[in-house]
UniProtKB/Swiss-Prot annotation:
Residues 32-56 are annotated as: Disordered. Residues 1-22 form the signal peptide. This is Transmembrane protein 41A-A. The chain crosses the membrane at residues 84-104, 107-127, 170-190, 197-217, 236-256. It comes from Danio rerio (Zebrafish). Keywords: Membrane, Signal, Transmembrane, Transmembrane helix. PANTHER family: PTHR43220, TRANSMEMBRANE PROTEIN 41A. The gene is tmem41aa. It is a multi-pass membrane protein.
Length: 281
């Protein structure tokens, strides 16, 4: 009971912090509107509600591509004068999702590509993914170990058996689980402290193992921000970027799978129900 109270307190505190960031926004860039004489004048009090006046009501986790596009446009608007605040808001929202195992990080990865570009967006999402997963690890270690075992006894037992079988190659086993596209990352994050996986090993496996997945999402966001029509989608530059993305994403996984077939004991991972849909990653 005490562990549940502690977890609820952490969730409430984090939610209040994130809500405060989204509501008490700094003033956005000065808006202008066209007068009847053709001159540009500043928007004044009493005018129709501007974009920045309704911004707080539009800041929410995107659940589809339309909401994602609207969110990207709004944050790009604020980013022109408040880059630091937008970065703080994005990082806070990302860590909130990861720490509490909330699905939908792919949308935030795409948003990172649209806001910050491919390379900075990739570095940012890799760091945030790793830190957020580690926070989930620590929360599970502090508050949830007993409840997770109670809720998922068979899956925990099966994963515990596989970890012990691959203890001599534990890092590569963890990399395999992260590269494997159907592995539920939220479940791996929460069960790792139960399996006695060292936090440093966990940290490195998440950072490296989810890098290809993050790269695909960030590159998609970066490309979408540059595409204005369907014709742009089939340009040579876009096609080459897609091919490069596919190669970079598939190569590490192929190498790990080749290693795993020779050195790791993986029988039963899929048949015991560990695999799940990609959207729950």
């Amino acid at each position: 009971m005490r562990s549940l109270v502690g977890l609820v307190a952490v969730i409430v505190t984090a939610t209040f912090y994130l809500y405060s960031l989204s509501v008490f926004l700094p003033p956005g860039p000065q808006l202008h509107k066209q007068s009847h004489e053709g001159e540009t004048t500043d928007a004044k009090d009493g005018d129709e509600p501007s974009e920045m006046e309704t911004a707080s009501s539009r800041l929410k986790f995107p659940s589809d591509l339309d909401e994602l596009k609207e969110m990207a446009e709004l944050l790009q608007f604020y980013k022109t004068e408040h880059t630091g605040y937008v970065l703080l808001l994005f990082c806070s929202a990302y860590l909130y999702k990861q720490a509490f195992a909330i699905p939908g990080s792919s949308f935030l990865n795409i948003l990172a590509g649209a806001l910050f570009g491919t390379w900075f967006g990739l570095l940012l999402t890799c760091v945030l993914t790793t830190v957020g997963a580690t926070l989930c690890f620590l929360l599970s270690q502090a508050f949830g170990k007993h409840h997770i075992v109670k809720l998922f006894p068979d899956k925990v037992a099966m994963l515990q058996k596989k970890v012990e079988e691959n203890r001599s190659s534990l890092f590569f086993f963890l990399l395999f689980l992260r590269f494997f596209p159907m592995s539920p990352n939220w479940f791996l994050n929460m069960t790792s402290p139960i399996l006695n996986i060292p936090v440093t090993l966990f940290f490195m496996a998440v950072f490296i193992g989810l890098m290809p997945y993050n790269f695909i999402c960030v590159q998609t966001g970066s490309m979408l921000s540059q595409i204005s029509s369907l014709d742009d989608l089939f340009s040579w530059s876009v096609v080459l970027k897609l091919l490069l993305t596919a190669c970079v994403a598939l190569l590490p996984g192929a190498l790990i799978r080749k290693y795993s077939t020779r050195h790791l004991h993986l029988d039963g991972l899929e048949t015991n129900g560990l695999s799940q849909n990609k959207k729950n990653r």
